[in-house]
Amino acid sequence: MARARPRLVPHGSGARDVRSRRRQLLPGFFGAVAESYLSYDETYAADEAASAAVWAPPGAEDDEELPTVLGEVVEEYAERLFEILGLMEAKHPVEPLYYLFLLGTRPGWQGRGLGSSLMAPVLETCDRDRVPAYLEATSERNRQLYIRHGFDVTDEITQPGGPTMWPMWRSPRLI
């Protein structure tokens, strides 16, 4: 999973060193996020963790310890992490919704429908219960995947020294 979403460590010179550092930091990052979100019972994995989806249901309370844990995990990139999380929080809707914090698939497993299969149960619940869903797409490829599942881009977040993210909203579909 650490190779599925390498956005925390900024792009720049020394590409090999940057990739190496990402591989060191991101497993701890994803582990801390998954552990924090497990209590919501909306965390899914497929094919021996080749793909995972981490959702928060409507009314989920923030884990107040998670930022501290993540700051310790990402070490010298904590300031950047908090900057990114602040940008995300500023765009986050306030109404009750399902929030997809993380969807990732290992590169060798991408394009097989694993991510779609992991979104399906929650999106079906959204439709049945008439609850919207929200996420931030972190790449053009992911943005296109989410559009295929009924999400619409609502804004744009430009990360300092990094790629653009797109907040996306999905209204419940009639069933």
Identify what each model region corresponds to.
Residues 1-3, 101, 121, 143-148, ...:
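N-terminal secretory/targeting leader peptides
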Residues 97-98, 119, 151-175:
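Long, positively charged, glycine-interspersed low-complexity recognition regions
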Residues 116, 128-130, 139-156, 160:
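Conserved active-site alpha-helix within GNAT-family acetyltransferase domains
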